[in-house]
Amino acid sequence: MTVEQFYEFCLVNRDLRIERTASGEVIIMSPAFSDTGNRNGKIAVQLGNWAEQDDTGEAFDSSAGFTLPNGAIRSPDVSWIKLERWNALTEEQKASFAPICPDFVIELRSSSDTLKGLQKKMQEYIDNGVSLGLLIDRTNRKVYIYRPDREPEILDNPETVSADPELPGFVLRMAKIW
């Protein structure tokens, strides 16, 4: 499916969670289960509050789709983009699946997600320009930290996860996410 066809498909199916792979394959996902949506909200609030105070970037929830350099259109559970990069986009670009890869992404594994599938998605984000990615695996109480040119760092049952130095001062509190 082309980008234009994908956009039209999304407009007609606003109630679906849809992504597009780099090869044009359309992935239709079920809505998040209530508990996952609640935890995604808690993560988005923490990042959003930090972003408002820090004022160096814009935070996004899972409803935002981005066109990555490889052509995939992805919607991370939570993401953040440096203000100068976001402001470099035209208003028309911002009002679509913006052609930009976030600087920071978080994916929260739900019971319908496979760990392997999310790990592949996190690597795709890194390969397309993400500076820092967090994969939160509630089932096993692990956080996988992704950075370019490194193997993922794995934290076992952390109370907090620091996003330094990429997002100075942002610390994700895990108590209400587990």
Predicted regions and their residues:
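Gly/Pro/Ser/Thr-rich low-complexity, intrinsically disordered segments predominantly at protein N-termini
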Residues: 1-178
